[in-house]
Amino acid sequence: MQLQLISIVLILHFMEYTNCQHHGSRHRGNKQVSGVSSQGCQGGCQTCSVYNGCLTCKPKLFIHLERDGMRQIGVCLASCPNGFYGTRSPDRNDCIKCGSECDSCFNRNFCLRCRAGSYLHKGKCMESCPDGLVPSDTKKECVAACPALCDLCQNSDTCTRCVPGHFLHAGQCHHVCPDEFEPNDSMECIPTVHCEVSEWSEWGTCSRSGKTCGFKWGEETRTRKVLQNPSPMGSPCPPTSEKRECFVKKKRCKPPKGQRRGEKKKRFNLQEKVTAEARRERKREREKETIDREESENRNKTEQRRRRDQSRDAGTV
């Protein structure tokens, strides 16, 4: 590479000398390689040429030669482009072209990515893969031959994705998931989850139509909670409430306080009504007794008068 730089400088010397002879405008007393300069260089150049761009770069930058017809134009870059790898030395940092089969490389003998039609294997680009490996068009690499029914695999024993219609379980592809497993949306077998419930609570208060009095037979209820909902193929949850018939000693329901006062007043009014009716009934009975007695007395008096009249008539005869 140093020899290449010396050649470029000599060419520039010659071109500059020819240019001076042609124009006749330069003095030999001021003769210098005016085509090579550190003034006005751009793009990270440390020294540059009008005809060939950058000749040397600032520290940490790589010089990369781009072909322009018969010329090579030097540019300074922070990293080398695809198809080139960088080398560093105390004098300069250069971008070196990868091997013809490499699209990207770590060095000339170790490819990182291959050109179309080749597949990467251990840093080399191959048109066909070694025995036991198959080319991957997605990775552009030689990969392990997948087991049967595998669409993608980690190695020759472990699948990572199955062909359509099959399910992945423990690195293998199955027509159906094993017992106690079920498929998810990604066609993977996952453990089946069954419903879990808590213990039953204590039996509740015996009641009937929401009341706890005024009956002998009622119902009491107990409940339990769902601790784990089931997966689609898991065992469903059992009932979470249960009822049974219950017996209690019948007792009268006490009305609310306001209603109790109203009922008391109602009973008092009813009692007063009954009492008044009874008094009226007794009055009617007394009046009837008086009338009956008077009628009886009148009948007796009439009978006595009739008898006296009969006796008087008989005496007259």
UniProtKB/Swiss-Prot annotation:
InterPro entries: Furin_repeat, Growth_fac_rcpt_cys_sf, R-spondin, Rspo_Fu-CRD_dom, TSP1_rpt, TSP1_rpt_sf, TSP1_spondin_dom. Keywords: Disulfide bond, Glycoprotein, Heparin-binding, Repeat, Secreted, Sensory transduction, Signal, Wnt signaling pathway. It is found in: Secreted. Residues 194-254 form the TSP type-1 domain. The keyword tRNA processing does not apply. It holds the Pfam family Furin-like_2. Glycans are attached at residues 184, 300. Residues 251-268 have a biased composition (Basic residues). Residues 251-317 are annotated as: Disordered. Its main location: secreted. Residues 274-303 have a biased composition (Basic and acidic residues). PROSITE patterns: TSP1 (PS50092). GO terms for biological process: adipose tissue development; blood vessel remodeling; cranial skeletal system development; negative regulation of Wnt signaling pathway; positive regulation of canonical Wnt signaling pathway; positive regulation of non-canonical Wnt signaling pathway; posterior lateral line neuromast development; regulation of odontogenesis. The keyword Glycoprotein applies. GO terms for cellular component: extracellular space. FU repeats lie at residues 34-86, 92-135, 139-183. Residues 1-20 form the signal peptide. PANTHER family: NEUROHYPOPHYSIAL HORMONES, N-TERMINAL DOMAIN CONTAINING PROTEIN (PTHR46987), R-SPONDIN-3 (PTHR46987:SF1). Binds heparin. The FU repeats are required for activation and stabilization of beta-catenin. This is R-spondin-3. The lineage of its organism: Eukaryota, Metazoa, Chordata, Craniata, Vertebrata.
